[in-house]
Amino acid sequence: MTCENETKPDALLDQRASQSGLPRTYENPCVHFDACQPAVEYALKNDKKLRLHTLVWHSQTPRWFFTEDYTNEGELVDREVMLKRMDAYIRSVLEYFDTQYPGLIYAVDVVNEAFDVGNGDQNGVRQKDNLWYETVGDDYYYHAFVSARKYAPSYMKLFYNDYGCSGKVDLILKHLSQAKEEGLIDGIGMQSHLSTEDDIQH
């Protein structure tokens, strides 16, 4: 099972708690898991495993997560702070599922849709509308895998996820080669969206 939205950053990050906890939470944003609880309970009841989608993505990650005071209009933090927030967020999510529901999460989409020729920089790393790129830089995806490997138990396999991969296979492989060589990534996921109205025979 894979949740469409319930385990994406904007569903798990807790703005109010992050703000009220300052300065303690400045480098450690708060999370909550209310949105994904129905899916978790369904999976447990029906003996299903969950794929965690997704930890680091340019979309559906609120702007306040990247700002000094966790407000929507605040100034963006610098690279050092955002790397610490990334690490803390990944730790919080992975440790929650490992301690509360050990064995439930079989795979984690650590980074989603980071490479895009049309909306990327000169190296194809997505730059447009990407606050990860703006705050951390063009290597943000690598650091996400470093953190994920640090906190993920062995039963959670770590993936890069994307769509339309046929047109950017070489780009993806080039950028993920270091992570692969260092044992930080287990595979590449290729997503699709099907509805009950789709004719899967054609």
Q: Whereabouts are the PLM-identified features?
A:
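Substrate-binding cleft and catalytic face of glycoside hydrolase catalytic domains
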Residues: 2-18, 23-159, 163-165
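Distinct, well-ordered alpha-helical segments
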Residues: 120-122, 144, 166-182, 199-202
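Short beta->alpha connector loops
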Residues: 164-166, 194-195
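Substrate-binding and catalytic surfaces of secreted/luminal carbohydrate-active proteins
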Residues: 150, 154-159, 177-182, 187-202
